[in-house]
């Protein structure tokens, strides 16, 4: 792009690092990673440079999402091949499940594998869903949504822990049913549904 010729040294370093990260990892770097790569300690200074790059039409940002910094030269490639989906680790008390402090990593998932909506990935811990074919260590692709229909497999938050169960709403309580004959259902008055399981990834 012609606008790249008008960049200062620091902005060019930042743009090159964003492109390199997208190419090598399949997802953009965080603001903190950009600062570390180019020697800037202040996140606000990095943000200022990102605003300038966006004004020059060299990147596209979504301030509501972490790591949503896409170099426009690479945007068609990223959109047509894969999307960067956050992998959720431990859920911090009181925070939305996609808050940056809950995100351990990102995985590139082919767009054809994802439907509509926002998604996250959760690594399965335990064997409560083995009879549904969901094993310990599997990675679940989860569509973010706040409710579910009876019988759907959901990720629910209980005491700030993410659990995977079948969802059933009864008259005055919610039943979270495991797919393991050795385990009992969990009943609660109400529950926060983080999303519906939409797919599964497994390493062999």
Swiss-Prot record:
Keywords from the UniProt entry: Autocatalytic cleavage, DNA damage, DNA repair, DNA replication, DNA-binding, Hydrolase, Repressor, SOS response, Transcription, Transcription regulation
Keyword Hydrolase carried by entry: yes
Ranges of the DNA-binding region feature: 31-51
Enzyme Commission code(s) on record: 3.4.21.88
Function: Represses a number of genes involved in the response to DNA damage (SOS response), including recA and lexA. In the presence of single-stranded DNA, RecA interacts with LexA causing an autocatalytic cleavage which disrupts the DNA-binding part of LexA, leading to derepression of the SOS regulon and eventually DNA repair.
NCBIfam families cross-referenced by the UniProt entry: lexA
Protein name, UniProt field: LexA repressor
Species of the source: Syntrophomonas wolfei subsp. wolfei (strain DSM 2245B / Goettingen)
Lineage: Bacteria, Bacillati, Bacillota, Clostridia, Eubacteriales
């Amino acid at each position: 792009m012609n606008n790249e010729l008008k960049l200062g040294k620091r902005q060019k370093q930042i743009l090159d690092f964003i492109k390199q990260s997208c190419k090598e990892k399949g997802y953009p770097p965080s603001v903190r990673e950009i600062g570390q790569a180019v020697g800037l300690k202040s996140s606000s200074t990095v943000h200022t440079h990102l605003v300038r790059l966006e004004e020059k039409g060299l990147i596209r940002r979504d301030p509501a999402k972490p790591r949503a910094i896409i170099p426009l030269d690479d945007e068609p490639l990223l959109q047509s091949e894969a999307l960067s989906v956050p992998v959720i680790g431990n859920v911090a008390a009181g925070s939305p499940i996609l808050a940056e402090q809950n995100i351990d990593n990102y995985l590139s998932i082919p767009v054809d594998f994802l439907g509509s909506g926002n998604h996250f990935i959760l690594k399965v811990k335990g064997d409560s869903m083995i009879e549904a074919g969901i094993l310990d260590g599997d990675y679940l692709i989860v569509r973010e949504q706040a409710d579910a229909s009876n019988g759907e497999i959901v990720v629910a938050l209980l005491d700030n822990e993410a659990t995977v169960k079948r969802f059933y709403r009864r008259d005055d309580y919610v039943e979270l049913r495991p797919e393991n004959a050795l385990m009992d259902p969990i009943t609660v008055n109400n529950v926060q549904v983080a999303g519906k399981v939409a797919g599964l990834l497994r390493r062999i």
